[in-house]
Amino acid sequence: MPIKHAIVHLIEKKPDGTPAVLHARDAELGDSQAIENLLADLNESYNAKNKAWGFFQGESGAYPFSGWLGEYLEGDRDFVGFSREAVEHLQKLMEESNLSTGGHVLFAHYQQGMTDYLAIALLHHSEGVAVNESLEVTPSRHLDLGQLHLAARINISEWRNNKQSKQYISFIKGKGGRKVSDYFRDFIGCQEGVDSPSETRTLLKAFSDFVESEDMAEEQAREKTETLVDYATSQARIGEPMTLDALSELMDDQQPRAFYDYIRNKDYGLSPEIPADKRTLNQFRRFTGRAEGLSISFEAHLLGSRIEYDEERDTLQISSLPTQLRDQLKRRKAQIGE
């Protein structure tokens, strides 16, 4: 993962309305194993988060970031100057948001395969302990990437080469609610263009319709379900969208266009590339439910075979019980009989 440019600035800010203080670095970070490890760990943490996808708002006084980025890429300003302009804008937006807290702001322009990316993340420290050379336990501070809540990644290659794209920016959807992350999204100037959960649900609906139209046997349907979910999960893990072309080929190498053509002919309105939503995928793979001391969870493909749902009676009928459960029930029945 070649790193072309990287820099870190510090914004000191508390969520109490006090002014934000910027400590700007005046030179890029040099090449080192430490920065490579940081970026690798950052990407791993970022890829595991739930994200939204979108594209740049039209450049304006309210959304100047894309203009600065374009100037940097065209060579009209250097990376340090671009990052300084951007972090000063972020500082201003932080001061306007009473919910925001400061942190170290990382800008990293790197290449993965043939694709250029710009990663921007607000990093925080955590207090821990370490053992020093004298074998004494001492306080230790480290960047806590597990608490990564505000970060974005821009696919520079997609932005510059595909003007119609609406999903070349991804950013973390904050757990604290939309208001907490609003200022960071506005800092990037990102407009959400793809509803990942909705697109994923539509894809899964199209898949279910396709399986039904092909009148597949249960085992074949289960295998194709696993293929879809495994592919979607692996793409989500590396932070890349699914492509309908690739998915269709994985579904049937003998008829690699079958699923793709089915989707297009039925006009589901799906984008060629779909960011996978992990929560929606998990719900598709398993049915789960809890209520009043009862917990049920089973794989989706068992519905209609070992598990039957009667909607009118509001009941589930389960056949071929797990051995452990069956033994427990037998023992309990014997105890009651005594």
Curated annotation (Swiss-Prot):
UniProt keyword annotations, A-Z: Cytoplasm
Recorded GO MF terms: double-stranded DNA binding; single-stranded RNA binding
Lineage: superkingdom: Bacteria
Keyword Zinc-finger: no
Cellular localisation: Cytoplasm, Nucleoid
Pfam families: NA37 (PF04245)
Name by which UniProt lists this protein: Nucleoid-associated protein PA14_59050
Organism phylogeny: Bacteria, Pseudomonadati, Pseudomonadota, Gammaproteobacteria, Pseudomonadales
